[in-house]
Design a protein with these regions (language model features):
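N-terminus-biased targeting/localization segments
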Residues: 1-38
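Short alpha-helix boundary/capping and kink motifs at helix termini
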Residues: 30-250, 262-263, 267-269
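Short beta-alpha junction loops
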Residues: 233, 273-278
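Short, conserved phosphate/pyrophosphate- and ester-handling motifs at nucleotide-, phospho-/glycolipid
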Residues: 254
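Short, low-complexity, polar/charged sequence segments that are solvent-exposed and flexible
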Residues: 249, 270-272, 289-292
Length: 300
């Protein structure tokens, strides 16, 4: 190390995508070494004197917080809160993948090798790539979101008499922005079902109607343009009473495509990139992804 400093070699080692294995046209796995981590879930800086030095986390784009994700506490419910919009970084990175996204119908080694420079922008770790056809809907009302509906389902299971406290208003569960969600939870085994929500990385009101219409026409003609989502499985045992699993992610590219799919009621083609092995979904991450892929994996 001293020799490296003496020679002035302080630059970061280049990212390497390794152990690339395509399991099927809808599933692949790979690892990233020396990843740039430009898009990642990171712990907030500790507050001076705090007894919880690494507690809250945020989804960050080039170090700028986009969504507050909350802690790793397994008995706390998952909740996302919009903080700010990134400086188009997600779109710039994902745009380098667009050539094959126009009508993506299968994953292959050549495709993922071609995208190595983009995958190297991710955080160091092990990943799964899933090509999915997901029934999504756009939700703009708090009472329609799974963020609130899962809370009411827990209350019903607990025998709540309907006299909900003030802090259980729908707005208190709302992430602060319209987003896309699964039309129904994914049925599971150990965990009964998985909720799903994909959050935008750009203001929804900035979507161009002409672009949405163009993608809608392509979908109607039988094409399946793909969106790119960086996501993960989050497992919780809320209040030590309720098993709860989420597939949650940030849309890196394809906001217009997802809007077109949702408006047409056609399952959305999604390339999901999911880091596995760490965080609150560490135990059930692979299990949850396998259940989602079994139901919604793109059929060859």
């Amino acid at each position: 190390m001293r020799a490296a400093w003496a020679d002035g070699r302080t630059e970061r080692a280049p990212a390497v995508v390794r152990d690339l294995v395509v399991e099927s046209g809808a599933r692949a796995r790979f690892s990233v070494d020396e990843g740039a981590g430009r898009i990642r879930v990171a712990f907030d800086p500790p507050s001076p004197g705090s007894s919880w030095p690494r507690w809250d986390r945020c989804l960050t784009f080039d170090g700028k917080p986009l969504y507050r994700v909350g802690s790793l506490c397994d008995t706390c419910e998952l909740g996302l809160t919009l903080l700010d919009w990134p400086d188009d970084e997600a779109a710039r990175i994902a745009a380098r993948m667009r050539g094959r996204l126009t009508d993506l119908d299968r994953l292959d080694t050549a495709l993922l090798a071609e995208w190595s420079s983009v995958l190297g922008e991710l955080e160091t770790g092990h990943y799964r790539a899933l090509l999915l056809d997901l029934p999504l809907e756009r939700v703009a009302e708090p009472t329609r979101s799974w963020w609130y509906r899962r809370a009411t389902a827990r209350a019903e299971a607990d025998g709540d008499d309907g006299d909900r406290p003030e802090y259980d208003r729908p707005d208190d569960y709302w992430p602060g922005v319209a987003h896309f969600q699964l039309t129904a939870p994914v049925p599971g085994g150990r965990v009964p079902f998985t909720y799903g929500a994909f959050m935008p990385s750009q203001p929804p009101e900035a979507l161009a109607p002409a672009a949405v219409a163009r993608h809608a026409a392509a979908v109607a003609a039988g094409e399946r343009p793909a969106a790119v989502v960086l996501g993960w499985i989050d497992d919780r045992y809320v209040e030590a009473l309720h098993e709860e699993r989420w597939l949650v992610g940030a849309i890196l590219d394809g906001h217009h495509r997802l809007a077109a799919y949702a408006a047409a009621g056609v399952p959305a083609r999604v390339l999901l990139l999911a880091r596995v092995g760490e965080g609150s979904g560490a135990d059930g991450g692979l299990e949850g992804l396998a259940e989602v892929a079994a139901v919604y994996g793109c059929r060859e």
